UniProtKB/Swiss-Prot annotation:
It is found in: Cell inner membrane. One of its GO terms (cellular component) is plasma membrane. It comes from Escherichia coli (strain UTI89 / UPEC). It is a peripheral membrane protein. Belongs to the ABC transporter superfamily. Xylose importer (TC 3.A.1.2.4) family. This is Xylose import ATP-binding protein XylG. The keyword Transcription regulation does not apply. Its main location: membrane. One of its GO terms (molecular function) is ABC-type D-xylose transporter activity. It holds the Pfam family ABC_tran.
Amino acid sequence: MPYLLEMKNITKTFGSVKAIDNVSLRLNAGEIVSLCGENGSGKSTLMKVLCGIYPHGSYEGEIIFAGEEIQASHIRDTERKGIAIIHQELALVKELTVLENIFLGNEITHNGIMDYDLMTLRCQKLLAQVSLSISPDTRVGDLGLGQQQLVEIAKALNKQVRLLILDEPTASLTEQETSVLLDIIRDLQQHGIACIYISHKLNEVKAISDTICVIRDGQHIGTRDAAGMSEDDIITMMVGRELTALYPNEPHTTGDEILRIEHLTAWHPVNRHIKRVNDVSFSLKRGEILGIAGLVGAGRTETIQCLFGVWPGQWEGKIYIDGKQVDIRNCQQAIAQGIAMVPEDRKRDGIVPVMAVGKNITLAALNKFTGGISQLDDAAEQKCILESIQQLKVKTSSSDLAIGRLSGGNQQKAILARCLLLNPRILILDEPTRGIDIGAKYEIYKLINQLVQQGIAVIVISSELPEVLGLSDRVLVMHEGKLKANLINHNLTQEQVMEAALRSEHHVEKQSV
């Protein structure tokens, strides 16, 4: 049986740089192939070639789809062939309804008039196909990210898709939403729809894939059956070296208590009847890594936003640093107390995309380069920028490059560099490795271990339980705004954490295995 897709010897250059160098990829109808590689490895470039974003003639090589050569000059050419791509940044219009988004550019008309009855009927069938029980008239902006992702798939199905490309589809989804999405992909597979799945979450890659293709530095490293590969095998192929331990387990000692929070309660910014954090108390020691785990909506981010002074609603409670009660109502007061934070959404809250990498790094510490006068010491600032880039291993062609052009991992390193310029005693990391590749994750994990060895206290909030358990000395478990457990991490398991989160009792338990 002929392949559904064959990409033969694809080479794509930008100037003198080969982004893709003689890469071949093939898959059958109904096959799920995961495309793995670090950020900058060439995955996105290869997919843009396939989809016609980079038109025929701008690359070398040949693309055969359903037995015919594709010479696309535009993405609409490949869509008409049955190839659809769903990017991590969803391409939905939030102000339009679900129906309007699904049929945008593909409206059903009779004599120039849109047939809303027929489109509604078709939309209902598409939504049922992706297990979405919502009205076609629902405004997309009122949906959660998981539901929006499914609307994107329904939109692709409306175009008679035969090959679906998913780029980091679960980066912002909950565990339950991820499970629903993977089930739908498997169902589409049963209907003969092939899928190219791109993700840094290797547990998902293993769970969903028939075949795994690895690209490194623009070159095809290998394609293997997923059943015969472990996560360690994938990592080794991706980074070109064996990572003996993803989570560095370097010994460090904890010191005296540096932070204590007592009876913290935070209310919804709009509805004062809803408590997002409910009577939470905990402490933190110097040189300790404190993980905070829980399902989405548990109140983890709200808790640390109160600590950093950026929670938009009202809150009450007491914060003690070095045994003294402090009042923190904005981020400037938090920074003055030695607290720095890497936010959950780096694109929205962490970077200024059009500003240079260097300027993003020094943004919160410009007073270091003024010397008491209003004029910046440009030489001192540039020296500090270059040292930070080197220390954090930020991969950029220039410190003047707009940070929005860097990979997610390098953006995250730049934000960390900014935090370290503040000489923090307490560092808060909210989803520190979301959407970044395995190599960048490893470097950030090593940095966290180095910081706690210097006595810096670190709070890690993560939706990935293996990350929380791999890094933390102690784990707080939250559920629906309440602290359910305070667990010392002596070989804690994911099952123990989830059991603690879902237990009906509200008292705090301690584990000292």
